[in-house]
Amino acid sequence: MKMTFRWYGEGNDSITLKQIKQIPGCSGLMGVIDQYAAGEVWEESVIAEYVEHVHKAGLEVEVIESVNVHEDIKLGLPSRELYIENYIKTIRNLAKHGIKVIVYNFMPVLDWLRTDLARVIEEDGSNSLYYDEEELLGLTPLQIVENTSKSSNGFTLPGWEPERLKELENVLALYKNIDPDKLRENYKYFLEKVIPVCEECGVKMAVHPDDPAWPIFGLPRIAHSEELFDKILELYDSESHTICLCTGSLGSNPENNIPEIIRHFGGKNRVGCFHVRNVKYLGYRKFRESSHLSSDGSLDMFEIMKAIHETAPDTYIRPDHGRMIWDEVGRPGYGLYDRALGIAYLNGIWEALEKSSK
């Protein structure tokens, strides 16, 4: 297992590579290069510079996240051909510089969604990402975008890049005639084009679950349960077509048994990497993100790590969204301290599993 940390790049993150290097048991990054809009080719020179910078800090980078899929691909428009070709060029450029897993999603229009990016936790005074369906129902998509932008502490947020959202109302209208089956059909077309290239290059595509794990604003969503992921993997049978199994995204719905889902897909070698975090259920479709500690949330992190250890022991893991603690100010969900604590906790569980299995 390789324990990693998400990093947004020099000048685009409140955290330095030096700080990440000092986290015990963290071997590298799940990297992000967010200067490109969805549909653009990631230039090889930019990728090379990013990777070299990480290596000089004594860290690895074999996973790249947020290689966003253009909406025209999801909608199945004729213009998708250009954007698919650009995506293929990006895959090849990433593979040339040692990238083995590419994380993306196929969520229409809106990526992950919260109704509050800094809800104060009464028990300790920290704050974390929060979702309440009742609050969401009183807001329009445009209001959600505006609220998210205002609460980002000046940082771009993955899935909420300005260029993706400036035509929000127009794009939402285009999805009125797209149901889940049609979205899957368009997804299959995309996979049939890109997965053979991944096989050729030795790269895995890892699709991230819907977050939260249910439809929003009437948009089709096709990646938020074991059954739906079975359908996704049936679209193209290849070990290069995998899941980025995010425990917090799938775990936002208490009907999802996360250890069972891990064993189901990990046993088939169809998990490319893991985002591991905890959530606290507060009511129907209402939750906040907690520390990684099992007792702080609603997910059993020991059982989650045990399932990973049993079925995907050579995988990549990173702690996912953390609380903002100790007066830290940074990108919501992506501070240093709580995620570093998460790594220490998850590595402790892993060490116990390793030693008890011998």
UniProtKB/Swiss-Prot annotation:
SUPFAM superfamilies: Xylose isomerase-like. InterPro entries: Man_deHydtase, Xyl_isomerase-like_sf. The keyword Manganese applies. GO terms for molecular function: ferrous iron binding; manganese ion binding; mannonate dehydratase activity. Its EC number is 4.2.1.8. Pathway: Carbohydrate metabolism; pentose and glucuronate interconversion. GO terms for biological process: D-glucuronate catabolic process. Its cofactor is Fe(2+); Mn(2+). Keywords: Iron, Lyase, Manganese. Pfam families: UxuA. It catalyses: D-mannonate = 2-dehydro-3-deoxy-D-gluconate + H2O. The keyword Iron applies. Catalyzes the dehydration of D-mannonate. Belongs to the mannonate dehydratase family. This is Mannonate dehydratase. It comes from Lachnoclostridium phytofermentans (strain ATCC 700394 / DSM 18823 / ISDg) (Clostridium phytofermentans). The lineage of its organism: Bacteria, Bacillati, Bacillota, Clostridia, Lachnospirales. The gene is uxuA.
